[in-house]
Amino acid sequence: MHGNTQSTASGVKTRRFDDILSEVTQAFEIHARCGSILGGVHLELTGEDVTECTGGARNLADEDLQRAYKTTVDPRLNYEQALELAMKIAAINNS
């Protein structure tokens, strides 16, 4: 997640859910081609209902970030985005 932080037009630091999912999916594909196993994924997340990363099931947009942007360092997935990503990782891993 560390390599995909972006800034919005108004300068708010964020991450895009689809970019994170793409990064994880690519990692699984690369490991599969190499015959190795991806042993873990590092995610920055919180159990709180923050709006720091865009996308996900609620389709948060840049305009939504100000509603509950609480981080003082890096944007985190909120609890819904984290669960959604975990379910997608499980589906990839079981395919």
Q: What is the meaning of each model-derived region?
A:
Residues 1-95:
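Expand to "…catalyze enediolate/carbanion chemistry for C-C bond making/breaking, isomerization
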